Amino acid sequence: MAKPLKQQKIAVLLGGTSAEREVSLNSGNAVLTALRNQGFDAHPIDPKEYPVAMLKEQGFDRVFNILHGRGGEDGTIQGLLEQIGLPYTGCGVMASALTMDKMRTKMLWKAFGLPVADMEVVTRTSFSQLNPQVVVEKLGLPLMVKPSLEGSSVGLTKVNAIDDLKSAVEFALQYDETVLIEEWLSGDELTVPVLGNEVLPSIKIVPQGEFYDYEAKYIADNTQYFCPSGLTEEREQELRQLVKQAYDVVGCRGWSRIDVMLDGEGKFRLVEVNTNPGMTSHSLFPKSAATVGYSFEQLVVKILELSL
């Protein structure tokens, strides 16, 4: 019989070595404080400084994983935790690895008949054959160019002119071997949290600049968020069903946040999955959860309770 959660020693994994280290430290400290305030025996563990493989030997019973980006959100730490036999929050190995790869996630959604943006894929090896003319004929202008793997909108460019396409792809290739060139989705940007099997209210993101980049996500205070997002109840219901399908198709569990854009005709298009959403004062998951009655501390405890 497992010990009650309050009697378990809980490691809060935070920091790490990805480009999103700082955000993870902020999220981790917020989660740590929330757990301690609720009477949990929680300890901060930064994999950059502490060997995670030793956690079980050190008497830990469970992990709250709030690492962001590569290493923490891509299946590697999940595999290690499976190996040493510690239950952890969030998605398992397969869903974490898959959703870190935006291209393969979209291909899977598309195969299940779920709506995504039209795209072309360029790799380092295929770059020399890139024909901007053909791409623009197929996808139009403007275009969105982004690395397939890096999180937090690093390496993104909006391409307005055909002559700028190659340099945008080269820029994105600095961050990843594989780059996506996508049709520009001109409608609203939404993000939808899922907690266990419950889809929470959508949030509308209105950045002051061209799109929601790293600075807007974590630094700027001029990005506006609306929750509820202003969709009609009928549209919100349609979005809820779409997001739940998207979540299930890629095998998410525990909690995740799914980004959705509207195209020029107002149709939903799935963008990507965040399997370890931010949990800072700026973060969107807690904002949405608050509208259905979760305090930040209750939300953190619920995510912990969903750990497997």
Swiss-Prot record:
The record ties this protein, via PROSITE patterns, to:
ATP_GRASP, DALA_DALA_LIGASE_1, DALA_DALA_LIGASE_2
Which residues of the sequence carry a binding annotation for Mg(2+) 2?
272, 274
Where mainly located?
cytoplasm
Its pathway, per UniProt, is: Cell wall biogenesis; peptidoglycan biosynthesis
The record ties this protein, via Pfam families, to:
Dala_Dala_lig_C, Dala_Dala_lig_N
Tell me, which GO biological process terms does this entry list?
cell wall organization; peptidoglycan biosynthetic process; regulation of cell shape
Task: State a single Gene Ontology molecular function.
Answer: D-alanine-D-alanine ligase activity
EC number(s): the record gives 6.3.2.4
Q: Which GO terms describe its cellular component?
A: cytosol
User: Which residues does the UniProt record annotate as the domain ATP-grasp?
Assistant: 106-305
How is the cofactor bound, as the UniProt entry phrases it? Binds 2 magnesium or manganese ions per subunit.
Q: What PANTHER family does the record point to? A: D-ALANINE--D-ALANINE LIGASE (PTHR23132), D-ALANINE--D-ALANINE LIGASE B (PTHR23132:SF23)
Q: What is this protein called?
A: D-alanine--D-alanine ligase
Q: Which organism is it from?
A: Histophilus somni (strain 2336) (Haemophilus somnus)
Instruction: Tell me the name of the encoding gene.
Output: ddl
